Amino acid sequence: MEIPLQEQESSLKSSSEPSSSTSEPVVNTQGSDNQGEEILSQLYRPLEACDNKCYCKKCCYHCQLCFLKKGLGIWYDHSRKRSSKRAKVTASSASDESLSANTGDSQPTKKQKTKVETKGLTDLGPGR
């Protein structure tokens, strides 16, 4: 099962020469460099408006803006409205008054409790 010398020499020559399969990765690395530069340029480019209203997985990841809005749920468009100190003071005093009014109505007074207890003790009803 020995290979003749001519075939061995030809196989050595073909292995030392760059084949089409070895030249493809070189092209791919150059292409990937271009892709990397393109991705970086897209990263630093300002986000463009996207009017896509769909929330499916494909639409959530199709552009960076949709990913931020739909995928992560981050909205930078709305600014927070800060209320003044006066509004906080009046809101807290109004909430205190409403809480005291609600708690007074919801709990029975001591007089009502004693009436229920005495009535339960006097009325024995038919028992054993």
Curated annotation (Swiss-Prot):
Annotated Basic residues bias: 79-88
Motif placement: Nuclear localization signal, and RNA-binding (TAR): 78-88
Family: Belongs to the lentiviruses Tat family.
GO biological process: positive regulation of viral transcription
Segments for region (Cysteine-rich): 50-66
Region (Disordered): 1-37, 79-128
Organism listed in the record: Human immunodeficiency virus type 2 subtype B (isolate UC1)
Role played: Transcriptional activator that increases RNA Pol II processivity, thereby increasing the level of full-length viral transcripts. Recognizes a hairpin structure at the 5'-LTR of the nascent viral mRNAs referred to as the transactivation responsive RNA element (TAR) and recruits the cyclin T1-CDK9 complex (P-TEFb complex) that will in turn hyperphosphorylate the RNA polymerase II to allow efficient elongation. The CDK9 component of P-TEFb and other Tat-activated kinases hyperphosphorylate the C-terminus of RNA Pol II that becomes stabilized and much more processive.
Protein name, entry field: Protein Tat
Domain comment (free text): The Arg-rich RNA-binding region binds the TAR RNA. This region also mediates the nuclear localization.
InterPro entries according to UniProt: IV_Tat, Tat_dom_sf
Any Pfam family hit: Tat
Complex and partners: Interacts with host CCNT1. Associates with the P-TEFb complex composed at least of Tat, P-TEFb (CDK9 and CCNT1), TAR RNA, RNA Pol II. Interacts with CCNT2; the resulting complex is unable to bind to TAR RNA.
Compartment annotation: Host nucleus, Host nucleolus
Record-level Gene Ontology MF annotations: RNA binding; RNA-binding transcription regulator activity
Low complexity bias: start-end ranges: 7-24
Keywords: Activator, AIDS, Host nucleus, Host-virus interaction, Phosphoprotein, RNA-binding, Transcription, Transcription regulation
Regions of compositional bias (Polar residues) in chain numbering: 25-34, 90-109
Modification after translation, per record: The phosphorylation by CDK9 does not seem to be important for transactivation function.
Region (Core): 67-77
Residues found modified as Phosphoserine: S92
GO CC field: host cell nucleolus
